A protein has these predicted regions:
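Catalytic active-site module of serine/aspartate enzymes centered on a nucleophile-bearing elbow/loop
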Residues: 217-248
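Flexible "cap/lid" subdomain of the alpha/beta-hydrolase fold that forms the substrate-access gate
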Residues: 1-16, 20-218, 222
Length: 248
């Protein structure tokens, strides 16, 4: 991303990052501060867990390497409880293992589950067709599912989405030093900084609560709802918040 930024020679940028946009982009801002004039983030964060107990690390690693089969239902159940107490790594590891083990990852279905209103029956039948390898023939496939499956001609192209969750630093890894440098940068950040979150996304709710400590200069906007992918489900509301922030 830094090479892309430098190659295009962008400047006077207002940055907004969500999900991986924040995990990657917030560090990019810290590495090129003179190119950015304002920063906003939502449903994302900069995970930094240097003091994670060794027993938690061991349990996560054992689980990832185990032969346990994680279903879409059990994975979703664990993620929905990630902000209910306990170490978040012990919940997030279900998402990591589910993605890594899913040779034909149901990217369209997972997106549909979070981005559009569908009956449980419709979702269940779509998942059944996906599991059997007949998703292209499913009468339950929505246009959104088709759109999010379109970039992948066959399951062999899905290795990127399958692997990316294991790169989220929920336990100490090779990114620890870079995360620490970014956090040191934001602790002294003086340019306008806005946090705008859904507030009903269990995965990132804990990250929202850390922003005042992470960026003392930050201003928090009231939650706008919409779940994890609120840039899709609350597009107009989020766009309005960001446009107002840019025009201030």
């Amino acid at each position: 991303m830094s090479q892309w930024l430098e190659k295009n020679n962008f400047s006077d940028i207002t940055f907004f990052g969500q999900d991986w946009g924040g995990l990657i982009g917030l560090r990019m801002v810290a590495e090129h501060p003179d190119r950015f004039i304002k920063v906003a983030m939502g449903n994302t964060g900069l995970p930094y867990n240097p003091d994670t107990p060794q027993e938690i690390i061991d349990e996560v690693q054992r689980f990832r390497q185990s032969k346990i089969k994680v279903s879409l239902i059990s994975m979703t159940k664990q993620l929905m409880q990630i902000d209910k107490g306990g170490h978040p790594a012990l919940k997030f590891m279900y998402w990591q293992k589910f993605c890594w083990d899913a040779e034909n990852m149901a990217i369209g279905l997972i997106s549909s589950q979070m981005m559009e209103k569908r009956s449980k029956f419709s979702l269940a039948m779509q998942y059944l067709f996906q599991t059997l390898g007949f998703e292209r023939f499913s009468p339950f496939t929505s246009e959104l599912v088709k759109a999010y499956e379109a970039p992948f001609p066959d399951p062999s192209y899905k290795m990127g989405p399958r692997a990316m969750p294991t790169q989220v630093p929920i336990i100490p890894d090779a990114s620890l030093e870079a995360q620490a440098r970014a956090l040191e940068f934001y602790a002294k950040f003086e340019k306008p900084f806005l946090g705008v979150f859904a507030g009903n996304d269990p995965v990132t709710n804990p990250m929202k609560d850390l922003i005042p400590k992470m960026v003392p200069n930050a201003r928090m906007h009231p939650d706008i709802g919409g779940g994890h992918f609120f840039q899709w489900t609350r597009a107009r509301e989020l766009a309005s918040v960001l446009v107002n922030f840019m025009e201030e």
